[in-house]
Amino acid sequence: MSPSLTFIHASDLHIGAPFRGLRELSEEWARRLSDAIPAAWDRVVEAALSRKVDFVVVAGDIFDSTRASYRDYLRFFDGLKKLDAAGIPSYLCTGNHDPLSLWQRDFFALPASATMLAADRPDFALYERGGEPLAIIGGRGYPNKVWSPQENIAAGVTRDAAEKALGPRAAAAPFA
């Protein structure tokens, strides 16, 4: 029987993004909607834990860089720590709203099982279960807020490039 794996892919969380005009609705709706964005991340973590997924991918725009606060970072990193404690690795990349150059790296360090994919080049990670390579995770984050429309962000994110970067074990991974 061939191996299977489960994972959650989330993107565009925009933690810290403001909702505009909420006070015009009501104080209650303003509070609910303001809590909705970070609560979405909490639900991703809860789903990963309850379903015992193999890994979680969070691909781009984790934060709204101009608005993310210490509290926003704390909430996100607390979720990463819960995943880490459960043995669920996470793979992250930055987006145009939270380029790596604007991350508040002095707030927190990534847990041991969290991998931040590079922003200056295609990058890869190998997911293994019990020493068996099962999946190649590849991507490229945003190094800054502007990406040239002439440059293909996915250029170089290929299986061949992953196998070169990760070595011969990557060739055995059935999923890429």
Annotate the PLM regions.
Residues 55, 66-176:
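His/Asp/Glu-rich metal-coordinating catalytic cores
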Residues 1-74:
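N-terminal active-site segment of His-dependent metallophosphoesterases
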